[in-house]
């Protein structure tokens, strides 16, 4: 034992003792704080969470100030936020009770300010907290993120073989039968430990988000302490039935999908349940089944309910839990505005999946600004007093708008026609290509298949058009092909470094002729 690096502290009933043993070792006795595995502890465990959050929050604020000085796109700021800043707090959120609400509120406010560089949010927060393929920016919703991290303990309780698991299992024997009870049971049972209470609070919220969508999933739903099945506005609490193997909907159903009679149920379960209790219980179950609109034709249930099976089968980490918790099945407002404005059917799922696959951060951010209708046009700039009028900067004939800037303007249409012509002349795979408004704006069109390089060409063309607008010059095909050739060289070099050169060469094989055109 290295006495110089050893500290001793009294805990429990003797925590205020001043006794010191082995004084010859010159150990530090009763330090005000001590650190184990990155967590600061004191004699009063209730203070641990506050002390750790305050210490790390100060460090996080310094990182925000440092990175705020950099000129980075919002997508780049999100990456920094998740990988370099919030990573300082993740281990605390996993291991300690949830931080106080004011801590979460302050941190969330700073996160949004950082992403938007201290300016007003340009996209609704309920959208930005979603992942990119759902139309968001992946800005972490701190409260939900903490819930998702706490949910990882439910999976650990099931699959871990480490000895720490024996402690909660010994303290709470019902953890061996998680599938037998609804989430409210754990909320009411685990109250004397704030950390474990937070874990099961997260589980309860998760259960409210995950709904069964098949017969077997519905039949595996627990009946007891489940808010979906109530008797007189009170949850069913016949937990003593669990000892007789009765806890989910399937145990009230016969093989043909019909409900058991009272006599059949008593025979099957080995219990003696009175008619009133049985009838009230089955009535609440029938109401729940009716609301679910799922037909019951058998009594074959999954081993565990849908919430637990989702948790157990999730890949490592908390990403899946977080995405489920933040998902509200609502499309971003921009989708409704575009559909109303263009009067066309757009597969927004396809649009956002394509955005997610864009590797170049600047191109991805340009595309997201177009989709979310936040890219600067002269109409907006005129209201801000930046431009003298609202007319298009190219034709000076029509009012500027996103669709006009990238498609409807006569000069821009001429540019797209020239690009379409050279693609058809030089690229065999592009013989049937025809640029449309949806294909240009959103990268997808019904009945038109594209590949990775073609999508990149469209993105590069839009970036070129926007740069020409800022530089107040007309876009020409020759200048664009020069920029495309430069982009090709950069991507080729990156592919060579990353060992992806063969794939890169194959992808570009059909499009090399348009680059040779520019080379002369």
Segments from the language model and where they lie:
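Short, conserved micro-motifs composed of acidic
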Residues: 2-32
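Long, charge-rich boundary regions
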Residues: 424-470
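Basic, alpha-helical interaction scaffolds
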Residues: 25-98, 118, 151-159
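Conserved, non-catalytic sequence blocks in retroelement Pol enzymes and Pol-derived host proteins
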Residues: 45-52, 69-76, 95-103, 355-360, ...
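Short Cys/His-based metal-binding microdomains
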Residues: 384-439
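Short amphipathic alpha-helical coiled-coil/interface segments
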Residues: 85, 104-115
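Short, conserved catalytic/metal-binding micro-motifs enriched in Asp/Glu and His
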Residues: 34-44, 85-97, 134-144, 367, ...
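Extended C-terminal regions of large enzymes
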Residues: 93, 107, 120-376, 469, ...
């Amino acid at each position: 034992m290295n006495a110089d690096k050893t500290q001793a502290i009294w805990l429990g009933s003797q925590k205020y003792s001043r006794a010191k043993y082995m004084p010859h070792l010159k150990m530090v006795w009763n330090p005000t704080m001590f650190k184990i595995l990155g967590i600061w502890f004191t004699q009063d465990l209730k203070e641990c969470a506050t002390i750790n959050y305050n210490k790390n929050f100060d460090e996080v604020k310094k990182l925000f100030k440092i990175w705020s000085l950099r000129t980075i796109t919002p997508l780049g700021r999100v990456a920094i936020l998740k990988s370099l800043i919030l990573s300082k707090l993740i281990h605390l959120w996993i291991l300690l009770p949830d931080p106080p609400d004011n801590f979460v509120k302050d941190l969330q406010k700073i996160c949004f300010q950082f992403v938007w560089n201290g300016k007003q949010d340009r996209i609704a927060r309920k959208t930005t907290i979603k992942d990119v393929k759902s139309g968001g920016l992946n800005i972490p919703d701190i409260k939900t993120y903490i819930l998702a991290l706490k949910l990882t303990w439910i999976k650990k309780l099931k699959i871990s073989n480490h000895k720490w698991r024996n402690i909660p299992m010994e303290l709470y024997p019902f953890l061996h039968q998680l599938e037998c009870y609804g989430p409210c049971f754990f909320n009411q049972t685990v109250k004397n430990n704030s950390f474990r209470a937070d874990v099961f609070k997260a589980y309860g919220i998760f259960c409210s988000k995950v709904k069964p969508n098949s017969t077997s999933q519905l039949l595996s739903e627990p009946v007891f302490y489940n808010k979906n099945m109530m008797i007189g506005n009170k949850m069913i609490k016949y937990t003593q039935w669990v000892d007789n193997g009765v806890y989910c909907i399937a145990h009230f159903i016969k093989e043909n999908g019909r409900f058991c009679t009272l006599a059949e149920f008593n025979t099957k379960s080995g219990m003696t349940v009175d008619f009133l209790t049985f009838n009230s219980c089955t009535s609440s179950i029938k109401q729940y089944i009716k609301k679910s609109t799922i037909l019951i034709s058998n009594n074959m249930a999954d081993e565990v309910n849908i919430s637990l099976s989702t948790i157990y089968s999730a890949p490592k980490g908390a990403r899946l839990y977080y995405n489920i918790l933040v998902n509200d099945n609502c499309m971003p407002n921009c989708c409704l505005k575009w559909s109303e404005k263009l009067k066309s059917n757009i597969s927004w799922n396809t649009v956002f999946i394509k955005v997610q696959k864009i590797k170049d951060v600047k191109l991805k951010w340009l595309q997201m600004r177009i989709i979310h209708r936040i890219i600067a046009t002269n109409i907006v700039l005129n209201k801000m007093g930046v431009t003298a009028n609202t007319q298009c900067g190219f034709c000076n004939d029509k009012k500027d708008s996103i669709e006009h800037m990238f498609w409807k303007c006569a000069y821009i249409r001429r540019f797209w026609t020239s690009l379409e012509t050279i693609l058809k002349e030089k690229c065999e795979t592009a013989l049937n290509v025809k640029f449309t408004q949806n294909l240009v704006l959103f990268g997808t069109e019904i009945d038109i298949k594209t590949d990775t390089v073609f999508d990149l060409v469209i993105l590069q063309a839009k970036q070129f058009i926007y740069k020409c607008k800022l530089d107040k010059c007309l876009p020409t095909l020759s200048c664009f092909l020069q920029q495309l050739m430069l982009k090709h060289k950069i991507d080729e070099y990156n592919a060579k470094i990353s060992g992806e050169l063969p794939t890169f060469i194959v992808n570009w094989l059909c499009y090399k002729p348009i680059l040779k055109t520019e080379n002369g």
